[in-house]
Curated annotation (Swiss-Prot):
GO cellular component terms, semicolon-separated: cell outer membrane
Organism listed in the record: Shigella dysenteriae serotype 1 (strain Sd197)
The protein, known as: Outer membrane protein assembly factor BamB
Signal peptide: 1-19
Lipidated residues (S-diacylglycerol cysteine): C20
Main localization of the protein described in the UniProt heading: membrane
Membrane topology according to the record: Lipid-anchor
Family assignment from sequence similarity: Belongs to the BamB family.
Length: 392
């Protein structure tokens, strides 16, 4: 078992564990796989790179760039937000959300969830339980709202609402126009959970979200009423680690089917209307996954990259040469699957057979959040804050 991020009451630790017990002095040591040797079939190149503040350091974060109307929006943990020209990376505007703390110092904003762009606004959440809406034109704050807890997942905008899943198990809907809280749903919290929350998926007027209690919930967005809940991960085992049941990945809804993935649980297909389980496969992960056509692509909790069928979750291929390299979530780009790792490499994988087709050293600080593919561009932000635009 591999554990990347752990939340204990009053204590945040970024850990890498193996074995069955959190407190076992004889636990096995997890070793990162050596960098695989790859004969590049093409040469990925960096079109441009731009520094955005000090990045996230060694803190858990869900900050990654967003692209809209040929503008890249990115942020760092301290509170710097920048808009960049997507063609050359040149700065259009920058603002700081850090608060003044005396004459010469500022209190960092601790941005953690985002970036999301929609309807002329840039949305970002913080560990200080603040959600910001910035105007895309100049970065000025359109509104700022205090929510129920740390906003660790990215804001999701749908049907005039901004949906926020907080670290204390609350799903909140804010008015897109002014940030007013319209409703709050309690998703329950166990005593111990992984640090990080599922961002909701939206479909047919419902918000579908994973919870730290091992359940997937569907909520009526208009009124905040619970439609159904379904457990996909059961808290079992003799240790606290074994009993972690978080569903921190974002569900994917396709043709009336909800696909959800738990950490110590299952990849599960659920009926959107009833929540009933259609099929399940024993797999675990904290990384978001992809449903494309008749395939599911994912990175499991041990950093195996896998392709499975959408009907039944049958394994099509598995790439096991990146074990314990702390991979990002995958992204599809130009017909290949791309993942980043903690040493700053991008790995390009053939979607048909799982073989490597290219490898690229990009950044020495490493990657934690997934690449973003949009409008023919591949963007990724390193832990030190540098944003890269990659082409092949």
């Amino acid at each position: 078992m591999q554990l990347r991020k752990l939340l204990l009451p009053g204590l945040l630790s970024v850990t890498l564990l193996s074995g069955c017990s959190l407190f076992n002095s004889e636990e096995d040591v997890v070793k990162m796989s050596p960098l695989p040797t790859v004969e590049n079939q093409f040469t990925p190149t960096t079109a441009w790179s731009t520094s955005v503040g000090s990045g996230i350091g060694n803190f858990y974060s869900n900050l990654h760039p967003a692209l809209a109307d040929n503008v890249v929006y990115a942020a760092d943990r301290a509170g710097l937000v920048k808009a960049l020209n997507a063609d050359d990376g040149k700065e259009i505007w920058s603002v700081s959300l850090a608060e003044k703390d005396g004459w010469f110092s500022k209190e960092p904003a601790l941005l953690s969830g985002g970036v999301t762009v929609s309807g002329g606004h840039v949305y970002i959440g913080s560990e200080k339980a603040q959600v910001y809406a910035l105007n895309t034109s100049d970065g000025t704050v359109a509104w700022q709202t205090k929510v129920a807890g740390e906003a660790l997942s990215r804001p999701v905008v749908s049907d005039g609402l901004v949906l926020i899943h907080t670290s204390n198990g609350q799903l909140q809907a804010l008015n897109e126009a002014d940030g007013a809280v319209k409703w709050t749903v309690n998703l329950d919290m166990p005593s111990l959970s992984l640090r990080g929350e599922s961002a909701p998926a939206t479909a047919f007027g419902a918000a579908v979200v994973g919870g730290d209690n091992g359940r997937v919930s569907a909520v009526l967005m208009e009124q905040g009423q619970m439609i159904w809940q379904q457990r996909i991960s059961q808290a079992t085992g003799s240790t606290e680690i074994d009993r972690l049941s978080d569903v921190d990945t974002t569900p994917v809804v396709v043709n009336g089917v909800v696909f959800a993935l738990a950490y110590n649980g299952n990849l599960t297909a659920l009926d959107l209307r009833s929540g009933q389980i259609m099929w399940k496969r024993e797999l675990g992960s904290v990384n978001d996954f992809i449903v494309d056509g008749n395939r599911i692509y994912l990175v499991d909790q041990n950093d195996r990259v896998m392709a499975l069928t959408i009907d039944g979750g049958v394994t099509l291929w598995t790439q096991s040469d990146l074990l314990h390299r702390l991979l990002t979530s995958p992204v599809l780009y130009n017909g290949n699957l791309v993942v980043g790792d903690s040493e700053g490499y991008l790995h390009w994988i053939n979607v048909e057979d799982g073989r490597f087709v290219a490898q690229q050293k990009v950044d020495s600080s490493g990657f934690q959040t997934e690449p973003v593919a949009a409008d023919g561009k591949l963007l990724i932000q390193a832990k030190d804050g540098t944003v890269y635009s990659i082409t092949r």
